[in-house]
Amino acid sequence: MGGTPELKLYNTLTREKSVFAPIDPNNVRMYVCGPTVYDFAHIGNARPVIVFDVLFRLLRHVYGESHVTYARNITDVDDKINARALRDHPGLPLNEAIRAVTEKTETQFHADVAELGCLEPNVEPRATDNIEEMIEIIEKLISNGHAYVASGEVLFDTKSMADYGQLSKRPLDEQQAGARVAVDAHKKNPGDFVLWKLSSHNEPGWDSPWGRGRPGWHIECSAMSRRYLGDIFDIHGGGLDLIFPHHENEIAQSRCAHGTEVMANVWMHNGFVQVEGRKMSKSEGNFVTIHDLLHTETFGGRKWPGAVLRLAMLMTHYREPIDFSIKRLEEAERLLAKWPATEPGDAKPDEAVMNALADDLNTVAAVQALHALAQAAHTDAAVGATFAATAFLLGVLPKKAEIDEAVAAAVDALVAIRLEMLKAKNFAEADKIRDELTAKGIQLKDGKDAATGERVTTWEVKR
């Protein structure tokens, strides 16, 4: 690691913080559960995106940019997507309606995370592009005696796995209804879960040995992580709410299909996000999307920069719960305002910040050390370069080239959404996006593709 402090991570699987030892230092592999693209991402979704972006940056710094593979999936087949498609596009055939929902939502997600200063993952597979891999794993589970067919569904037999429940530490006999576990009469055991279910004529489906159907939620991540990272990989991340049943069931499927002792060596989970001391929910009226926070005045009567949201998240340790509030955002904004605008050059990150990050991503201590460094950076160019290199590692001060890339990605995403709005004849929303970009100095030019005749939009920064 060449002078870099020893990296220690808390492992949910062992309930211990231990030294991280990658399977292959030349190819460190990390998988993080990404969005289900039926609705815009909310600030709770922003937390794992930011947390694991910091870890991605740290791993790249320690092992080298070309020696880390970060995969974050897109779930684009789900009953919630079907319901949203029927609600929002009742006049379209379901497949077209689903495509309209998923494309718009995925595009918005990419725009949101770009504004939060996040690097793109190396791989971002969609569930619908990996159906064959899911079917292959299900066939293995049936042949290995870990799955069965009942009432047209394929289910995982939880009692066939002696140590099922090792991640959540929940004994099998305690796993009754609740925690997103459905209990049905055709199950052998209450905790058995769906690997494949039949689709009606108007639902999305794929041909399989068990009839035309679609995958269960958990099998999707098992298939995508294996395809891009292998049977066993280094780190699997996500929110605390995913420990059970999602991650527990991923482990069960993957281990029983491939005959491995583990699926991932380290399991990391970030804590919950509350809003002003209350659980975030639409019924509470405190449901805040990333887009709303950045581009509307619904939270605190103003818009907030992406860097402020990012820093506000990093001011609490990732395993602790966050009470997301206007006060917290204001505190982060005041802190950012005191930091110098400098370029990293060839400087190395600050040792105190590196020590903090190497201690299970202690971003609280890292931000404190970075702020102390900022005071001297205003008057000392060398310290300023160190400050910039360190801030870049936290993603709160991107390199100029990455600022340009992030802005371009965000603009491209908004332009794509506007085109979809124009196609749907939703001119009010399209004009709103155009006005929003104009206010930021971005000029749009509408035209037609000479070959296809389709509407195209280009953009440029007004000089």
UniProtKB/Swiss-Prot annotation:
It is found in: Cytoplasm. Zn(2+) binds at residues 33, 221, 246, 250. Its cofactor is Zn(2+). One of its GO terms (molecular function) is cysteine-tRNA ligase activity. Signal peptide: none annotated. Belongs to the class-I aminoacyl-tRNA synthetase family. This is Cysteine--tRNA ligase. The gene is cysS.
